[in-house]
Amino acid sequence: LHRAGKLGLGSATLAAIRYAVAHDYDVIVTMDADWSHDPAHLSALVAATEQADVAIGSRYVEGGAIESWPQHRRLLSRAMNRLSRTMLQLPIHDTSGAYRAYRVAKLREINLDEIRAVGYAYLEEILWHLAQGDAIFAEVPITFHQRRAGRSKVSLREAAGKLATLVRLAWRPDRRQR
């Protein structure tokens, strides 16, 4: 799968998901390509999809960890995850982690065209849509490593977009109460 230019994490991931759906894959795995996600956790994530529709590599469950982040970044990440979990009523501790394994059969059940976030807010939005479809979630503890390549793309614009997405989804009139 090759795309010209950078169109955002959500856009890239949705293109990969559409490809997996069209080609009848069983499972699709997403992960960061900067070495912050250790491939050693891959088999545990895929194995978790035998019992769950979505397996999330989680920094925030027992056994999970973050390596080499300053305290303020850890606190901000935890606070944003708690806000997302509360506003969207998600049964997940790490809503913003991108290391995931999805059962393609469950992805096929949601309307991918309804997902509007193109940046990092996509991570919470797809979980919300899956939760609305009664997806079963599992969290697999991982250690998140400081990236070895590239720079963070998180910006004030991304943060504002995430908040706007949370508000849009939390107050959707067709939202199912949990």
What are these regions (language model features)?
Residues 35, 44, 124-125:
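An aromatic- and histidine-rich active-site surface loop
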Residues 3-5, 31-33, 140:
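Cofactor-binding loops of NAD(P)H-dependent oxidoreductases
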Residues 40, 50, 105-106, 132-134, ...:
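Terminal low-complexity segments of carbohydrate-biosynthetic enzymes
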Residues 90-91, 114-116, 127-144:
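Catalytic donor-sugar/metal-binding loop of nucleotide-sugar-dependent glycosyltransferases
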Residues 25-36:
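Short beta-strand-to-loop acidic/aromatic patch adjacent to the donor-nucleotide binding site
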Residues 3-22, 39-120, 147-157, 161-163:
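Acceptor/aglycone-binding surface of glycosyltransferases and processive sugar-polymer synthases
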Residues 1, 29-31, 55:
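Conserved Rossmann-like nucleotide-binding pocket used by diverse enzymes
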Residues 31, 58, 143:
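Conserved residues at the C-terminal ends of beta-strands
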